[in-house]
Amino acid sequence: MARAVGSVRGQPSRLIFPVGVHHVQRLIELVGLSLTQRRDMLICVLGTVSCLRVGEVENLQLCDLKWGHDAAWHSDYEGTMAVGVYKRKQDQVRKLLYPRVGSSVTNRLRAFVEELGLEVSDECSKERAPGARCRTCPPVFPRTVNGTEHSRPVSRQQVTNAVLNSLRMLEADTTHFSGLSMRRGGISAALVARAPEPILFLQSGHGSNNAARNYTVPRNPHPL
């Protein structure tokens, strides 16, 4: 609503920076973090490399994580994974999209999940209804990580806070960052790397450079 009112009044949109590749590289190397800090760091990193929206991070369930998804095709992909996004803005017919995630992020996420004792339910419904939310599997990112109650997912506000908390771990100024910074960072990195349009679609859901450019911030702003 605020964005719509602002456009009518001719006000510029709020400046939002992307989570950069340099942020992701530094975050994934952090050690000595508490469980809550690790959850926040992984939200920020996974959300960025998978080009996820805040609501998509909130909706992630353990059965959406496809460990070793591409390993059967080539051994180089052992230790990586895919993330099943069961509901995406551009996926009106629920074909699902599976952004790929490299081994360094996969290893950290798997260790986090195992430490919390999260497991896919024996009654998981994803195989029967892959385009629907599972009623039995736990969230990837629980609202609370202390104790044994992990059935409630993080809220959207917690996802946004996780991005800001992660950047504060790097002593970054968070004035111009928000939950949107994850998706903006992933798409920006893909376009700067000149990823082909089909690859951009598979990772982010955006099927055209015209649509993706709304999220794009160049890695080097000097030419601007």
Label for each model-derived stretch:
Residues 1-224:
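Extended, non-catalytic subsegments within catalytic or DNA/protein-binding/adaptor domains
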